[in-house]
C-alpha cells in the first residue's frame, strides 16, 4: 500500500510539472507562431518544413531506442547512462556529417536550390540532441519533471523572441531557422545547469549491447512511424509546392499544440510509472485504463471545439491567407483526439518489456497505411490527409489488441470507457459549430463559442456523472488540502 501511494504521489507530481511545462511552452509557442505566420509568407514555412522533415527523421536515431531502454531498465546505474551518452555523441556526429555531405543532393530532390545552407545550419540540432538525450532520460527515470519546466520554458521564450526580432528585420527563412536551433540549444544548456548527473569516464560495450537488445526495436518502430508521418509532407512539397506543404503542416501543427500538452505529459510520466508496476498486471491495467479515460476527457473536447471554431479562429489570428489550413486542421483534430488511447496502450506494452510486440505492431500499421497512401497519393494532399485519418483510426484497434491478452483490457472495453466522453464532445462541437455562421465579428463569435462549449461540456460531464470528471475534481481537491495542510 505504501509503495502504491508513493508511486501515485510521484505520478501526480510528474503530471503536474510536465503539464505545466508543456502547457506553458505551448502557449508561448502558439503566440510566437501566430506572430511569425502574420509576418512571413506560407512559402517560407514550406522551405523550413522540408528541412525539419529530414532532421525529425534523423532525430529518431537519437531520441527513441536507447533513452527508452534506460527508462524501462529496472535499476540503471552510472555505467549505463555514461555508455549511452558517449555512444549518442559519436552517433550524432556521424549523422550530422552525413547530412552535411548529402545536403546538395537533397536540395535537388526537393527542387529547392537554397536548401543546402539551411540544412547544414539547422542540422546542428542533431548534435544538440545528442547532448540532451541522456539528461532527459535521467529526469524521466527519476521522475524529476520539475526540471523540464524551466528548461523548456527558457528555450521557448528565448527562441521565440529571437525569431520575432529576426522576422521583423527581414531575415525571412533564417528567422525560423534561428528560432528552432536556439530553442534546442537553450533548452539543453538549462538542463545541463540544473541536473546534477554528469557522464563519468566509463564505458561498457556489454552494457550497451544489453540496452540495444531492447532499444533497437523501439528505434526501428519510431523510425517507421516518423518516416511514415513525414512522407505526407515530403510528397505534398514535391508535388504541390511550398505553400500547400505549409498549409498541410500548419493544419497538423495547430491541433498538435493542444494534443502535445496532454499527451507528452502522459507519455513522459506513464512509462516510468508503468515500468515500476510491470510485475503487477492488475495495477498496470488500472493505471492504463485511468490514463485513457483522463487523457480522452481532456483532449477530446479541446480538439472537438477547436475543429468546430477553426474558420473564425484562423481568420482572426493569422489572416485569410492561411484559411486553406482549415480543412487539414479539422482532419488532424480527429486524428489526435484518439492519441491518449494510442499512447496508453503502447506504454503498457513497453513497460512490460515487449519491444518485439511494439515493433510488430508498427510494421503491421505502417504496412496498412502504405497501401492507403498509394491509393490516395494521386488525388492530392487533402485526399491523402483523409486517407491518413482512416489509417490512424484503424491503428487504434491494432495498438489495443495485444493488451486484451497482456493485461486483460481489450479494445472493446476501452471504447466503452471513452464512449460517453466522445459523444459529449461531439454534441458540444455540433452546438459550437452552428455559431460560426452568425453575422458577427470573429472575435465575438469565438468568445460566444468558447463560453458555450465550456458550459455544455462541463455541465454535461457533471450531469452524466462521468468518472473522469469526478476523479479530476477529487484529485484537485486532495492536492489543495495537502497544500493547505503542508
Task: Identify the function of each model-found stretch.
Residues 116-123, 151-196, 210-214, 247-252, ...:
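Hydrophobic alpha-helical transmembrane segments
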Residues 8-12, 69-78, 128-151, 165, ...:
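Membrane-interface junctions at transmembrane-helix termini in multi-pass inner-membrane proteins
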Residues 1-30, 68-71, 75-86, 115, ...:
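N-terminal membrane topogenesis motif
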Residues 1-7, 11, 146, 189-234, ...:
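Interhelical loop/hinge segments that connect adjacent transmembrane helices in multipass membrane
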Residues 2-3, 401-404, 409-411, 418, ...:
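Membrane-proximal transmembrane or re-entrant/amphipathic helices at the cytosolic face
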Residues 14-29, 155, 176-179, 183, ...:
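Transmembrane helical elements of multi-pass membrane transporters/channels
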Residues 7-66, 90-103, 120, 125, ...:
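Signature of the first transmembrane helix
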Residues 29, 61-78, 140-141, 199, ...:
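Helix-loop junctions and terminal segments of transmembrane helices
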Amino acid at each position: 500500500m505504501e509503495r502504491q501511494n508513493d508511486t501515485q504521489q510521484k505520478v501526480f507530481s510528474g503530471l503536474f510539472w510536465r503539464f505545466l511545462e508543456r502547457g506553458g511552452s505551448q502557449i508561448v509557442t502558439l503566440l510566437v507562431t501566430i506572430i511569425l505566420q502574420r509576418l512571413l509568407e506560407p512559402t517560407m514555412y514550406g522551405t523550413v518544413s522540408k528541412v525539419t522533415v529530414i532532421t525529425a527523421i534523423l532525430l529518431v536515431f537519437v531520441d527513441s531506442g536507447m533513452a527508452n531502454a534506460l527508462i524501462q531498465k529496472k535499476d540503471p546505474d552510472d555505467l549505463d547512462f555514461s555508455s549511452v551518452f558517449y555512444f549518442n555523441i559519436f552517433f550524432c556526429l556521424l549523422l550530422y556529417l552525413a547530412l552535411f555531405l548529402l545536403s546538395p543532393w537533397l536540395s535537388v530532390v526537393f527542387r529547392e536550390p537554397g536548401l543546402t545552407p539551411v540544412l547544414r545550419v539547422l542540422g546542428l540540432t542533431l548534435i544538440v540532441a545528442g547532448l540532451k538525450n541522456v539528461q532527459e532520460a535521467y529526469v524521466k527515470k527519476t521522475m524529476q519533471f520539475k526540471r523540464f519546466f524551466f528548461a523548456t520554458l527558457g528555450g521557448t521564450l528565448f527562441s521565440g523572441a529571437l525569431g520575432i526580432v529576426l522576422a521583423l528585420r527581414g531575415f525571412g527563412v533564417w528567422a525560423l531557422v534561428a528560432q528552432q536551433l536556439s530553442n534546442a540549444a537553450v533548452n539543453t544548456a538549462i538542463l545541463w545547469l540544473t541536473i546534477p548527473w554528469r557522464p563519468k569516464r566509463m564505458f561498457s560495450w556489454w552494457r550497451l549491447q544489453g540496452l540495444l537488445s531492447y532499444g533497437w526495436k523501439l528505434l526501428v518502430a519510431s523510425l517507421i512511424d516518423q518516416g511514415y508521418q513525414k512522407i505526407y509532407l515530403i510528397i505534398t512539397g514535391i508535388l504541390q509546392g511550398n505553400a500547400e506543404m505549409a498549409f498541410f503542416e500548419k493544419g497538423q501543427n495547430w491541433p498538435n499544440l493542444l494534443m502535445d500538452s496532454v499527451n507528452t505529459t502522459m507519455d513522459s510520466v506513464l512509462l516510468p510509472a508503468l515500468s515500476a508496476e510491470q510485475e503487477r498486471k492488475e495495477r498496470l491495467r488500472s493505471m492504463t485504463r485511468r490514463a485513457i479515460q483522463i487523457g480522452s476527457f481532456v483532449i477530446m473536447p479541446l480538439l472537438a471545439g477547436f475543429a468546430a471554431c477553426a474558420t473564425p479562429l484562423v481568420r482572426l489570428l493569422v489572416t485569410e491567407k492561411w484559411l486553406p489550413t482549415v480543412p487539414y486542421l479539422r482532419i488532424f483534430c480527429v486524428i489526435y483526439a484518439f492519441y491518449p488511447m494510442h499512447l496508453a496502450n503502447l506504454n503498457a506494452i513497453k513497460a512490460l518489456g515487449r519491444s518485439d510486440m511494439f515493433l510488430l505492431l508498427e510494421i503491421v500499421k505502417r504496412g496498412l497505411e502504405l497501401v492507403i497512401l498509394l491509393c490516395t497519393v494521386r488525388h492530392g494532399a487533402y485526399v491523402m490527409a483523409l486517407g491518413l485519418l482512416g489509417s490512424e483510426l484503424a491503428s487504434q484497434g491494432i495498438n489495443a489488441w495485444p493488451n486484451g491478452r497482456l493485461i486483460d483490457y481489450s479494445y472493446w472495453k476501452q471504447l466503452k470507457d471513452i464512449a460517453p466522453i466522445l459523444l459529449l464532445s461531439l454534441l458540444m462541437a455540433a452546438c459550437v459549430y452552428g455559431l460560426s455562421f452568425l453575422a458577427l465579428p470573429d472575435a465575438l463569435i469565438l468568445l460566444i463559442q468558447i463560453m458555450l462549449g465550456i458550459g455544455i461540456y462541463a455541465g454535461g460531464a457533471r450531469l452524466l456523472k462521468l468518472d473522469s470528471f469526478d476523479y479530476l475534481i477529487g484529485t484537485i481537491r486532495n492536492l489543495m488540502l495537502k497544500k493547505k495542510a503542508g
